[in-house]
């Protein structure tokens, strides 16, 4: 008799980021363990800058591992390989195949998140043999002064955006949102976005890590913090129109405010 599947719990995986903080450990009580090449385990404390907790990921690297039940120790990739449509349903399986189609994370944004953009499915498939990356952010907590940058506050040209990235003035044309707990924002492929300080986010996205970093708030000029930029590679996939405000839904913390 075939064993019955059950609700799975997965072991979270920490991702260190220069803009991260300690909220994932302190507030969400995450227990992160890292292993070195020799198999030695280290528990990450709240002194480590952790920007992301990968809760459910089928990415080929750092795949989520089942923590409970008789399938404990198996990865989500192995579950999909074995149980196919029993995991996601026949329609979803027929469309996406053996890769679990969602990547679910928690984000602790304690400093400036780079200005970035993601490709759509068509561009990602043609250029990188990958899914694109549409994502939804749910604001679990927002400290006073926290900001999200989503799209532009007016239409800009590709040349103006390119020049502003090099001049360090890109924030002048970004649409600014002062988020509150419970807000939801849909970040479509092509939407330039970033965030700054004091945000705890639940992120649900397509199963892709296709991120093009466009501007990194000056970190690129410091050898200690420099990360690769992809401005030339991504300049033609950006949506340069003003941000569509219907992509942002205010949460209950706004009350009756307009």
Task: Put a short name on every predicted segment.
Residues 1-156, 216-257:
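Transition-metal
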Residues 115-118, 178-197, 204-206:
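Conserved metal-binding segment of the jelly-roll/cupin
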């Amino acid at each position: 008799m075939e064993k019955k599947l059950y609700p799975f719990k997965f072991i979270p995986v920490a991702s260190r980021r220069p803009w991260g903080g300690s909220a994932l450990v302190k507030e969400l009580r995450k227990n992160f363990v890292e292993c070195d090449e020799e198999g030695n385990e280290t528990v990450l404390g709240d002194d480590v800058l952790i920007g992301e907790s990968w809760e459910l990921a089928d990415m080929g690297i750092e795949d989520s591992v089942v923590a409970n039940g008789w399938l404990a120790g198996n990865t989500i990739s192995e579950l999909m390989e074995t149980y196919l449509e029993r995991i996601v349903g026949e329609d979803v399986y027929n469309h996406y195949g053996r890769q679990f189609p969602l990547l679910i994370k928690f984000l602790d944004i304690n400093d400036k998140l780079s200005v970035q953009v993601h490709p759509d499915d068509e561009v990602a498939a043609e250029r990188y043999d990958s899914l694109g990356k549409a994502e939804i952010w749910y604001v679990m907590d927002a400290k006073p002064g926290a900001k999200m940058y989503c799209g532009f506050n007016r239409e800009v040209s590709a040349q103006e955006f390119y020049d502003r990235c090099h001049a360090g003035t890109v924030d002048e044309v970004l649409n600014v949102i002062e988020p509150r707990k419970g807000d939801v924002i849909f970040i479509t492929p092509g939407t330039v976005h970033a965030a700054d300080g004091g945000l705890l986010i639940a992120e649900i996205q397509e199963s892709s890590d296709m991120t093009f970093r466009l501007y990194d708030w000056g970190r690129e000029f410091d050898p200690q913090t420099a990360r690769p930029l992809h401005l030339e590679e991504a300049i033609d996939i950006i949506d340069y129109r003003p941000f569509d405000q219907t992509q942002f839904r205010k949460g209950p913390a706004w009350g009756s405010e307009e």
